[in-house]
Design a protein with these regions (language model features):
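P-loop/Walker A nucleotide phosphate-binding surfaces of NTP-dependent enzymes
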Residues: 2-375, 381-397, 409, 419-425, ...
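Walker B catalytic motif
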Residues: 372, 403-404
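ABC-family nucleotide-binding domains
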Residues: 402, 408-409
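Conserved hydrophobic alpha-helix in the ABC-type ATPase nucleotide-binding domain
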Residues: 415-416
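H-loop (His-switch) and adjacent beta-strand-loop-beta switch element
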Residues: 421, 427, 443-449
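H-loop/switch region of ABC-family ATPase nucleotide-binding domains
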Residues: 433-435
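Conserved Rossmann-like nucleotide-cofactor binding loop
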Residues: 438
Length: 449
């Protein structure tokens, strides 16, 4: 053990504005990099230490695995010795996708779904609820005492909006894309012959103009001068087959054919149903608008997933509560259970409360679990990363923190300090770039650039 390296040795660092820097960085301690803007703080932290730490770890994996992962390029440095595997908690974490929420990102939703699977009142198909029972966890048959119908208690997976518990209409996104009628004819002074109906120009054959004429619509009159009946045919007309005579625009070719009418709205809906990639979506999305799903009211959950009740509220309502309020509500669950259910309830609830603690310490108690992760600020997403890092209980990792105090209320600085100390206690190393003096004072070592 006496020969175990105590420092990372960096020699000849030339990344960005670093000019042949040599520096030793103590391991298993908090090291802060300070300096004026442009001095190379982030270049040393991210461009050298994180880049080399993550790259070398990935290079130790098999070729098959590396092909499926993106790795950093080799840093411009003569030598880096004894750098551990590195994880970066970026100042600007990547924006999550549409299916990610505060609840999924923190994994709090996993515990909450387990509560609703094991501890909830479940109901039969006739709407009769039964009290919480150990028979659910034991996977025993449950019969409604009122109508004698068999009761199905959904599993945690059946309560997940990214899986079996998804709303059938929106697919678990909470939003639906519908045709934006105003986008179909953007310039209402044009005639149909002049290309007034935009989807027919980009998503459909141009001869749809000829079919529309056969439907009884005047195609040589400005759209804003057409009758309501003609406009209705353009927007919503029936899919009737018409015999048309058509002539190509740029040649003398002409002919007759039977063609089915696609109204402007259906043209977009049909194109949307056939989208297979981002390129295809870009052609269609300009004719769409997003609205809250009318089926699930934005909760993302199916009707069945919203049925189980704990303390008289469903999973959807629990996810809408701010974390501060939700924690207090969860604390009351064990005492609301029948005596034989209380030990299991405490175990499940304690798991939720344990994960919540760090998030509350980091000042995220105002967020609800259903908050779309894409709407979170960069500071909020970074604090989620920090809380997850502590929960994972890793050891021997170099954590590179790029301005972790950004967006943090002064009252929550000590929560951040507690997180960093926990990471060190578990045998990790921290390298941070920050301007907050309270954070910098906690460092064991300073590197002044």
């Amino acid at each position: 053990m006496g020969n175990t390296p105590k420092k990372i040795k960096v020699r000849g660092a030339k990344v960005h504005n670093l000019k042949n820097i040599n520096v030793d960085i103590p391991l298993n301690q908090i090291v802060a990099i300070t300096g004026v803007s442009g001095s190379g703080k982030s270049s040393l932290a991210m461009g050298v230490l994180y880049s080399e730490g993550s790259r070398r770890y990935l290079e130790s994996l098999s070729t098959y695995t590396r092909r499926r992962m993106t790795s950093a390029t080799k840093a411009q440095v003569d030598e880096v010795l004894y750098v551990p595997a590195a994880l970066a908690l970026h100042q600007r974490p990547a924006v999550p996708g549409i299916r990610s929420t505060f609840g999924t990102g923190t994994e709090l939703l996993n515990s909450l779904r387990l509560m609703y699977s094991r501890l909830a009142k479940h109901c039969c198909k006739n709407g009769h609820y039964i009290e919480p029972t150990l028979n659910v966890a034991a996977e025993k048959e449950i019969i409604c005492p009122i109508c004698k119908e068999k009761i199905h208690a959904p599993s945690a997976e059946e309560l997940a909006f990214n899986s079996q518990g998804a709303c059938l209409k929106c697919g678990g996104t909470g939003i639906v894309r519908i045709v934006d009628i105003d986008s179909l004819v953007p310039d209402k002074t044009l005639t149909i012959d002049e290309g007034a109906v935009a989807p027919w120009n980009s998503l459909m054959w141009t001869l749809m103009t000829d079919v529309c004429r056969a439907m009884g619509v005047r195609t040589d009159v400005p759209f804003n001068q057409l009758t309501d009946e003609e406009k209705n045919i353009i927007y919503y007309g029936p899919a009737e087959k018409k015999h048309i005579f058509y002539k190509a625009k740029n040649t003398d070719h002409a002919g007759e054919m039977d063609f089915t009418y696609f109204n402007a709205t259906y043209t977009v809906e049909n194109a949307l149903s056939k989208v297979k990639d981002d390129k295809g979506m870009k052609r269609v999305e300009k004719f769409l608008k997003e609205e809250i799903c009318p089926e699930c009211q934005g909760t993302r959950l199916s009707k069945e997933a919203r049925k189980p009740l704990i303390r008289e509220i469903g999973l959807d309502k629990a996810c809408q509560m701010p974390l501060n309020d939700l924690v207090e509500w969860v604390r009351g669950i064990p005492d609301s259970m029948p005596d034989e259910m209380k030990p299991m309830a405490r175990e499940i609830c304690d798991s939720f409360l344990d994960v919540s603690k760090r998030l509350l310490d980091l000042g995220l108690g105002y967020l609800s679990l259903d908050r779309a992760a894409s709407t979170l600020s960069t500071g909020e997403r970074q604090r989620m990363q920090l809380a997850r890092a502590v929960r994972n209980r890793t050891t021997g990792i170099l954590y590179v923190l790029d301005e972790p105090s950004i967006g943090l209320h002064p009252s929550n600085i000590y929560g951040l300090i507690g997180v960093m100390n926990d990471l060190i206690h578990d045998g990790n190393s921290i390298l941070l770039v920050d301007h907050d003096t309270e954070i910098i004072k906690e460092a064991n070592w300073l590197i002044e650039m």
